[in-house]
């Protein structure tokens, strides 16, 4: 089971995505990110890695097609339920979000 919350920065960034970008992010989260997070191992295509110079913050790529790559930053949080995982979504957008993850 996965629980999550979003920082205001994530919610603000989300408003700047196109409907297509928003749909792509949701699709990747539902079909790949959540199952991989629950399994404890991420597939290579998500490109999950630590953000440099930002301890505890990770990034994933949710779009690698034409145009700028879609990125989202997140961090693990305290589980709300025994055996559950909890994350906090921090930012979403292009590579530029990594300047202030």
PLM regions and their residue ranges:
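Arg/Lys-rich, positively charged N-terminal/basic patches that mediate binding to nucleic acids
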Residues: 1-32
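Residues that form or immediately flank small-molecule/cofactor binding pockets and catalytic motifs
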Residues: 9, 53, 94
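Enriched for short, Lys/Arg-rich terminal
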Residues: 12-16, 61-101
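A general structural signal marking secondary-structure boundaries and capping sites
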Residues: 21, 32, 36-40, 101
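A short beta-strand-loop micro-motif that forms or neighbors metal/cofactor-
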Residues: 25-32, 36, 45, 82, ...
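A short, surface-exposed loop/turn module that caps and links secondary-structure elements
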Residues: 34-64
């Amino acid at each position: 089971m996965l629980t999550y919350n979003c920082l205001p920065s994530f919610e603000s960034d989300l408003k700047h995505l196109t409907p297509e970008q928003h749909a792509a992010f949701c699709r990747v989260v539902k079909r790949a990110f959540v199952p991989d997070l629950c399994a404890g191992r991420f597939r290579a295509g998500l490109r999950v890695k630590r953000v440099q110079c930002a301890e505890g913050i990770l990034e994933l790529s949710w779009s690698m097609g034409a145009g700028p790559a879609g990125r989202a930053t997140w961090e693990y949080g305290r589980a709300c339920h025994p055996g559950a995982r909890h994350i906090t979504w921090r930012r979403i957008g292009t590579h530029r979000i990594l300047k202030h993850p």
